[in-house]
Amino acid sequence: MSQENVEIVRSIYEAFNRRDWDAAFRDQHPDVELTTPPGGPRSGTYRGRLECQRYVQEWLTPFEASTVEPEELFESGDQVAVVLKVQARPKDSSAEIEIRIGQLWAFRDGKALSLRIFPEPEKALEAAGLSE
């Protein structure tokens, strides 16, 4: 159940790194919701696989290369909280950007139903009812 959800989240990140959108969205509910933190350039809630995929692809536009690496995954019922390392290199630059964010996935019937993104990893853990 929850361990299966953890493995689904891992496979989504692996597919993201390959830019394999079919695989990345295969285990997501057709009505999946992606909620980004307030204050960002495209903050808000995106609904449905296509809208979520469009958001992700637009987010990637300024970068020549980018990868995500789940450093820690915590299962809590039908949720998976993630401490995620994001590495990116902007186009026309040799600068490397590395940040850590939090993500909270919610599942229903083996499908990712929602993803909430947090600028601070500990906020995702708090939202899941977990503490470090």
Indicate residue ranges for each PLM-predicted region.
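C-terminal and inter-domain tail/linker signature
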Residues: M1-E132
